[in-house]
Structure formats: C-alpha cells, structure tokens
Amino acid sequence: MAGHSKWANIKHKKQKTDAQKGKIFTKIGREIAIVVKQGGPDPEVNSKLKDVIAKAKAANMPNETIMRSIKKAAGEVDSTNYEEVVYEGYGPGGVAVIVEATTDNRNRTAGEVRHLFDKFGGNLGTTGCVSFMFDKKGVILIEKSDKVNEDDLMMKALDLGAEDFTAEDEYFEIITAPEDFSKVREGLEKEGYEFVEAEVEMVPQTTTTLTDPKHIEFMNKLIDSLEDLDDVQNVYHNWYGE
C-alpha cells in the first residue's frame, strides 16, 4: 500500500484523540447505536458491533461506557434515531475528501459540512464525485514494541487473510479486504495483539501533494473543523502530508 496517506492521517488523528477523548467516545457511541439497530445487541451474532467494540477499545473507551451505549441502543428509552450519510467533495488544491457522518437531522449536517467546504476553499460535490478514487479496506495498526516480533506478526496476519503488511516508523499497518477484516482482527486479538486502530476505512488509491502554503493551511483547517463537528464520524482524503 505504498503511497497512500494512512500514516499522515494516523498522526493527525492521534493528536485529536489525545485532546478530545470525550468527543471520540460520543461518536463511537453513535456508531454503536446504528449497528445495534441494524443487527442487535449481541456482538457474537452482530459482527459489525464486534468491530465497533474493537474500535472503541483501541480508543481506550471504558468497558462500562461501551456496555451503556449498547444497552441504550437496544432499548427504546432515551434513544435517538441516527442514520449514516456520506458527503464527497474537493478541498483546496483539488484534494479529494470523503466525510462520513451519523445524524438525526440531515439538513443540519449537510449545511454544516457545506459551510466548512466553502469557508476553506473547497466545494461539496455530488455522490460518487470522488469515491471512485478510494478503496474500502480494513486497516489495523499495532504499535511497535519489544513484545511484538515483526516476522511473527506478518506471518500471522497474512495467514489470516491480510492483503498487505507494512512497517511504519512507530506502527505495523495491516491492510485487509473489507470482507476479511473481522476474521483478521479477531484472529490477531486471540493471539493477544492490542490495536492502536482497527476499522474499515476509505483508503486513497493515489495521493496528491499541496505546495501553496495557503492551500496547506486551509486543508488542515478543513480537516480539523470537519472532525470537530459532532455529527462527523470520519474524514478521508488523498492529501499526502499534514
């Protein structure tokens, strides 16, 4: 997977996560609400819920908070109906951007997302305008440490069905097809590996760079501002750099 901007993205995300854990937990709680309504509250039956629980644990979300979110979603009391929406557009300098959101009010969310694209030199496009530039992939990140043997991890990941294995500066990155993600993640979990990140994401096929300082400034602000919106779950792009 050489050339995609995953590593740049994770550095960006890690800074945000450390500073805004409460907001991250709220967003994961919404994801739990959606997958529980789709497939029920039992993670042994609902593989999507099992995947979101793994994501929650990777974000250091407390078990009590996870269980409370599941129970709340399974009952009708105090439960908000959320739906998933995806926005596509271009950032400054023609960077392709995909925004995934969960919302109880499509009009509000669309207005907020459009405002930020306009504010920072981009434009919101129509469905499909940039998604063809991305592939849906399972992405698992495991922190490098003395306890993790690179060759062992690579062989286990590939034996479980991973498509690719890369050693980055601080992390091992494992890429899977979306349909193999749960199997690979669960297999590594059973082997005792802990994840910095484990989820299905939109990975750019190729990346682009920005040279204009104003474009770089505005692109950073666009990503930050979109991620700060309560309704936004994920922001994907094909910009290499940050």
Swiss-Prot record:
<dbReference type="InterPro" id="IPR048300">
    <property type="entry name" value="TACO1_YebC-like_2nd/3rd_dom"/>
</dbReference>
<keyword id="KW-0804">Transcription</keyword>
<comment type="similarity">
    <text>Belongs to the TACO1 family.</text>
</comment>
<keyword id="KW-0805">Transcription regulation</keyword>
<dbReference type="Pfam" id="PF01709">
    <property type="entry name" value="Transcrip_reg"/>
</dbReference>
<dbReference type="GO" id="GO:0006355">
    <property type="term" value="P:regulation of DNA-templated transcription"/>
</dbReference>
<dbReference type="InterPro" id="IPR049083">
    <property type="entry name" value="TACO1_YebC_N"/>
</dbReference>
<dbReference type="InterPro" id="IPR029072">
    <property type="entry name" value="YebC-like"/>
</dbReference>
<dbReference type="GO" id="GO:0003677">
    <property type="term" value="F:DNA binding"/>
</dbReference>
<dbReference type="InterPro" id="IPR026564">
    <property type="entry name" value="Transcrip_reg_TACO1-like_dom3"/>
</dbReference>
<dbReference type="GO" id="GO:0005829">
    <property type="term" value="C:cytosol"/>
</dbReference>
<keyword id="KW-0963">Cytoplasm</keyword>
<dbReference type="InterPro" id="IPR017856">
    <property type="entry name" value="Integrase-like_N"/>
</dbReference>
<protein>
    <recommendedName>
        <fullName>Probable transcriptional regulatory protein Cthe_2075</fullName>
    </recommendedName>
</protein>
<dbReference type="Pfam" id="PF20772">
    <property type="entry name" value="TACO1_YebC_N"/>
</dbReference>
<keyword id="KW-0238">DNA-binding</keyword>
<dbReference type="InterPro" id="IPR002876">
    <property type="entry name" value="Transcrip_reg_TACO1-like"/>
</dbReference>
